[in-house]
Amino acid sequence: MSGTPPLVDDAVRWVRPHTPRGGPSAVTVAELQERHWPAVREIYATGIATGQATFESQPPDWARFAAGKPAHLRHVAMDEGGTVLGWVAASPVSARPVYAGVVEESVYVHPSAAGRGVGRLLLQALIASAEAAGVWTIEAKIFPENTASLALHQKLGFEPVGVRRRLGRMSHGPHAGQWRDVILLERRSATIGS
């Protein structure tokens, strides 16, 4: 993985290759790079269209996406043929030094790969690389209706912090015009700052 500290490379390496339950082929987790962007953008757009993934109404361009997410906190999951099955990325929650170890993550899995353990592999890779980089808290903001994502995050140690009531108004999809609640979850490092 180019451009990442060696510890991050080592932390991510343990999750690959892996055969998800119900999946016919091994899945490789790698650093998300610009060459993956067309597939990542498509998966992002598919998630947006469901109305259950984000308030965003369209994916950003590569430059905007990459600018806010450090390379060592961006990963893709690919099958043996190199097809991108999903992605995860995290960005700092604040520029203030006191929050230097706090990030917010997003994880998206292509519908054809849902239920095969891809999301779990991606979040495990992010957790490992985040801890290797000194991150002590990973936050996730999830719509209450997205029960699969809530369950996945809780299985990996994310705990509900609270509900942000009517956090934003949807501009698109099946919930267009509605004010939506978001559940805030966080995963606190067991090794950093404990």
Segments (PLM) and residue ranges:
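A short beta-loop-alpha structural element at the N-terminal edge
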Residues: 27-40
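Conserved acetyl-CoA-binding loop-helix of GNAT-fold acetyltransferases
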Residues: 115-130, 151-155
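Conserved GNAT acetyl-CoA-binding A-motif
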Residues: 130-142
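Acyl-donor-binding surface of acyltransferase catalytic domains
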Residues: 1-23, 187-189
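Acetyl-CoA-dependent GNAT
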Residues: 13-14, 50, 54-112, 123-124, ...
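Conserved catalytic-core motifs of GNAT/GCN5-like acyltransferases
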Residues: 3, 9-14, 89, 97, ...
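Conserved beta-strand-loop-alpha-helix junction that forms the acyl-donor binding cleft
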Residues: 114, 140-150
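Conserved active-site tyrosine of GNAT-family acetyltransferases
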Residues: 44, 153, 158, 185
